[in-house]
From Swiss-Prot:
HAMAP family: Thymidy_synth_bact. It comes from Mycobacterium sp. (strain KMS). (6R)-5,10-methylene-5,6,7,8-tetrahydrofolate binds at H54, D172, A265. The gene is thyA. PANTHER family: THYMIDYLATE SYNTHASE, THYMIDYLATE SYNTHASE 1. It is found in: Cytoplasm. This is Thymidylate synthase. CDD domains: TS_Pyrimidine_HMase. The active site is at C149 (nucleophile). InterPro entries: Thymidate_synth/dCMP_Mease, Thymidate_synth/dCMP_Mease_dom, Thymidate_synth/dCMP_Mease_sf, Thymidylate_synthase, Thymidylate_synthase_AS. The lineage of its organism: Bacteria, Bacillati, Actinomycetota, Actinomycetes, Mycobacteriales. Keywords: Cytoplasm, Methyltransferase, Nucleotide biosynthesis, Transferase.
Amino acid sequence: MPIPTPYEDLLRLVFERGTPKSDRTGTGTRSLFGHQMRYDLAAGFPLITTKKVHLKSVVYELLWFLRGESNVRWLQEHGVTIWDEWASETGELGPVYGVQWRSWPTPSGGHVDQISAAVDLLRTDPDSRRNIVSAWNVGEIPQMALPPCHAFFQFYVADGRLSCQLYQRSADLFLGVPFNIASYALLTHMMAAQAGLGVGEFVWTGGDCHIYDNHVEQVTEQLSRDPRPYPELVLAQRDSIFDYTYEDVVVKNYDPHPAIKAPVAV
C-alpha cells in the first residue's frame, strides 16, 4: 500500500510553482493560495517522516492551548521555547490561541469556553453544523503578539467517527505546518475520546501556503527523502479533555529521517 504524502506533495507544488511574494517579516516567500490536505486518522498518526518533528513541543503546545494560557512561562518550565521569539520580557503574548479557545469575551462581560462547549455539543448534538472553535477574534487581534495563523476549526461526526477541519490563513510549510498537522490530529483524537467516538479524517485547509526564501535549501533536502509509514498514537483515558498530560500521549513506531534546522521568520 503506498504511503500517503499530501504534505510532501503540497511542499513540492509550492516549491516548484509558487509565486514570489514579499511578506511582513521581510524574508520573502514563494506562495500559492488555497489548498487542502486530508489525513485518515484511523490509518496512522500524521507525524511527518521526511524530517523529524519535535513531538514534545507539539504536545506541550497543545496542552498549553487547552490550559487557556497567554504566557510562555509554563512552556519554558517544560523545556519548550517555540513561542519565545514573540513573547514580551515578562513572557506575555496577549489574548492568543488558548485565551480565545477557553475564554472568548462576550459583550456582556462574560466569557465563552469554546472547547468545553465543543465537547458538550459532540455529546448532545453530534450532527450539529455549528461545532466551530475560533481563535480569530477581530476585536482583540491588536493586543496579540501574533494574530492566529491557524484561525478556526470545525468538528463533524459521521458513522461514529469524528473528523476535524482546520482553516490556516498563513501556512509556513517547512517549519509550521508539520507541527499544526500533528497538533490538530492529536486534538481530534482527544475530542473523539471525550465524546466516545472513533476518529475519522483531519482535513487541513490552507490560505497563503508559502515557503520562505531562507528555507529553500532545507526544503530541497526534505523533498529528496522517501516518506516512511506514519506512526501509531496511543492516548490514555482521561475523564476530561483538560486532564491530559504529556505522559498520556505515546507515539509508537515513529521512524523519521533526521531533523532539518531552519531559521524562524519573526
